[in-house]
Every structure is written in C-alpha cells, then in structure tokens.
Amino acid sequence: MKRCVNLDWLEVYCFEPVTGVRNADYFRSKGYTVEERDYGTRIYNEMFTIMGTDEWPLLEIRRSPKSSMTNGGIMPMNACHIRLTNRTCYYNDAAVQLQLFLDQHGFMFQRISRVDVCCDFERFDSGDYPQKFLRRYLQNKFAKLNQGRIHSHGEDTWDDRRWDSISWGSDKSCISTKLYNKSRQLREVKDKPYIKQAWLECGLIDNFYDCTKVLEDGTMHKPDIWRVEFSVRSEVKNWFVIEADGNAKKKRSVPNTLRMWAGREQLIVMFASLARHYFHFKVYKEGVRKDLLQDKELFRFRPNEETYKVDRLSSPQDEKKDLERLIAKLNKFAMTYPASEINDAVSTIVAKIEQIQLSRFAQDPYSWKELIAIQQTLAYRLQHKGIDPTSVLHSILTMLDGTVKPY
C-alpha cells in the first residue's frame, strides 16, 4: 500500500561554543534574516527564528537560560534548544541540514530532546480503513500492547459516533503514539501545502489542490488520509528506551542521534521499529492473556521499502498572496507592452483564472472577494494607466471585507 513517512518535529539540546554567544545579532552578522520575539519562554530569555534562503522560517532557537548556573540555577549558561520548523522537517535531508547548521556555527550537540516521525496513508497495509479499525478498537475488538493510557476525540451525532483521533501515553511518557485523521485536520485547523505535496509525491493523491485521486475505473475519489505518529522524548544522550514485546520489565535501548534520522530510508526503519513496539495490537478474546492473543496485522514493512524525494517544498502561503502576485505580474507585463492586444490577453487570462477558481473555491467567501477585487482592479487599471495596481487591489479588498458572500 502507498504510504508517506516523514519527520514532523526535530528539536535538539545544545551548548553554544565558548568562543562567543549565538544570539540574533550574531546570525544577522552572518547574513541571515532573523525574526526576534520581544519576549522569551518559560525557560529561556531569548527566542528567535532564522529564515532560510527562500525567506521562509528555517529553524527556531531558544537561548540564554533564566535559571543558569551563574545565577544559582541548574542549567549551563550556554545551553540552548534548536528546533526545525515544521516545513523544514519535510525536506529529504532535514536532519542533515540541522547537523550542518550546528557544525557551521560551532554548537556542541548534547541530545535530541524531541523527534516526531509519522506515516500517512489511506488504508493500512492489511486493507483496514483507519476509522473502522479505531471504532472496533474502542469497541474492545482489539487490545493494544504498551501505553495503557488513552485519549480519544470524535463527534457524536444522532445517527453515528465518529472517531477522528486517539493517542496513547501520558504527558510524561518518553514515547507517545497518535492515530488521527490528517485530512480533516488540514481542512479544519490549518492547511499545510508541503504536506499535501508529500502526499502527491508518494501517490496518495493525484490533485494537489483538491486532494483527490483517480481510481482505476476512472472515477474521482477524495481519500481520507490518516496518520500514525510517534513522539520520542529523551533525557539521555544518544539513546532512548523502548519496552520490548509489551513487557515493562523487558527494555531495549535504541540509538537516537541525528544520523539515525538522516533520510527517508532511515525514517522508515525507525518508524517500523517504533510501530513494532508501540502500534502492536492483538485480536481480543475474553479471559486470554494479551501476550497469547493472535496478532492484528496492520503494517507490513519490506526490507527494501520504496521511498520518495521532494526537490522543492511548497510554501505555506494562502491563495490571496498567490493571486496578488499573479495579478501584479500580469499588470507589469501589460505596462511594459501597452498594446491593445496585450490588454485583451490579460483580460482573457484573468477570465480563465476566474473560471478555474470559481469551481474550486465556490464555497469560500474569501476567494469570491479576491476575484471581485481582481476584476475591479483590472478595470480601474485599464482606465487609469499610471495607477499602482497593487494599491488599488489592497483598497478594494479592504472595502469588500465582510460584504462578499458565496453563492
């Protein structure tokens, strides 16, 4: 079955070099664009984000501990935490990029404080649909080894009860597990284009915008993509400990260095190892010990698992910015070549954009507002050659706020 394995969180605990502090001004002096927060965190005085070469957030640094040893506290004065942004985690070599950054600026790596690895799929390798499996699990059809504490979320209607997520493990657990409907989260909480791009690259969907795919019989299908996610926290340098075969007294240490998460192949190996211990289910039978029950097979990992690679990530920008940039480029072109046929061509292109966008965003009032604003901006631009189209567009968008409703 098609599946998509990625990092979703990577954070390390480091020491700054003794040769000098690594504050926001240091990175500005090295040519980075830095966004500094006016306040720190509960543990650190400073927090700032370093932008990548594409001007999107690359990583976040928290430094200058409030409880440092020089002030009678417990943390070394040069301690810091460095976290990749969520978008950066979806690069093929995210862990390698982080290691290169640490080496380049002299940080002394201590340990991975948190790493999340996830697998997205429509169905389990066994053919089970995640929502049906989750419902049966909550009906005691299956039993899970390890992590007895659970938290589930869903929706209770008159006709049915739908479960959208479940997590195992407490807040203090070194390893926690989560199964949830990722498609629903992207629709209702926050859209992340780079995640949909990953789905497209590995074949879970065929259409980036609508998140649909064409089945073998030619019909259009909109799959619900689910995610299994393991979150690993460790207080020990280079290792984390897992329970073997559901036995709390039988533990095994697993290497936990950046090298272990360096590429897709390594991610699949680490995910499979965690799934074996923390996504291990049995077919429940009353009166029979868990370790004697029949296994419920869900994932099947092959020795040579196929992986995908992303050459360039989509930027997490909304439709408004895309449309503004497109209109600005069209108007710039029309101003450079002020011929009547150019204006006609621009009008034709915008009409085509309207046709596509109306079918895609017919229920979104913000898209309707944008399209109306584009129409009015182009009309105004054709009548007033010297006007700045961007300022007109912003003025019209502001004027239309709260007034445009979808059909």
Predicted regions and their residues:
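Structured, helix-rich domain cores that form ligand/interaction pockets
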Residues: M1-D311, D322-Y407
